[in-house]
Amino acid sequence: MQMKNFKEDFPLLRENPVVYLDSAATAQRPESVINSEMEFYKKCNANPLRGLYDLGFKATECYEQSRETVRKFINARSEREIIFTRNATESLNLVAYSYGMNFLKKGDEILVTVMEHHSNQLPWRVVAEKTGAAVKYIECNPDGTITEEQLKQAFSERTRLVAVTHISNVLGCKTPIKRITELAKECGAVVVLDASQSVPHIPVDIQSLDVDFLAFSGHKLMAPFGIGVLYGRESLLEKMPPFLTGGEMIDSVTRDKVIYSDLPHKFEAGTVNAAGAWGLKTAIEYIQNIGFDTIGGIEEELTKRAFDGLMKIPHINIQGSNNPKEHCGIISFTIDGVHPHDVSSILDADGIAVRAGHHCAQPLMEFLGVPSTTRASIYFYNTKDDIDAFLNSVSSVRRRMGYGK
């Protein structure tokens, strides 16, 4: 397919020769997002939800318009179900502490997959320690697939909460979330979905997925740092106590009684990141203008190009599926005899940015039998030249490490 060069929309990529292949960690920001955040500070800079003057009203309007944009983007039923946070980590911790600590008890079981990012594992382990609930793992296969048998082995009449990733940040594979949700409903469990790696790449429809909570970070879909989203089913959010307390999340306070604000502000204590929310709105609009069909088509072609090229290089071991279409732009690999950190350093010397390490998924690394991997993650602003430069550099790693070839 003929690809548009989207790098022109991104100041860092336009003005810097870097080959950026670490979008699963954070995406680059288009000029429109950078400008929108600056415009907020130039024209609307006041404390939202507080100032009873024109500038304060404008700031509040921007903030709430951003919430409505997010609601439409993920097809939530009400803006009351959209909570702004700092990132997916905070969103998941909010659910763990506000829901898990209050509604789970000794003997209950929490299911997570072995592929989870630590942000969707550790909060549940803390909940288990505090409540007496138990964390159980849904096993997967080396290619990241989860079978019906593996699901049924994990679920039981004690399952009360299931926390799963939508797309693995290591293997790029999709979990069978609709089937997981069906099984969860059969035993009365709620489902918490980490959509950090899916929201930037594929359409995410809350009502179709029918999950109870969903979390993602803005920065992975080109929004500013410091803005994240938690979707929560309204009937559950209504029952949950606040996660943080302080300014602007109360209706009234006396010496003897506190009445908390209505949704969604009950969960947004303190001064909010209105500029970040406005930048998130712009990032969503930018994605919508391009379209997920275009984004997916570019990513699929470039992933196949990278995958096929790596398969031709000796001593390369790709983690996950043998089908590049099942990687969602994420390719984790190892090179025989070379530590991933050394691979990353060599590629960095060639102007190529990739991630090396355990990717905050150490139980998955243990399952795969590797301490760490090198990860290349592709987004629609990458080009064929980027992939070719990456492959050329990877092919030289063993020689440059003194192996000859």
Regions found by a protein language model. Give the residues of each.
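Pyridoxal 5′-phosphate
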Residues: 1-405
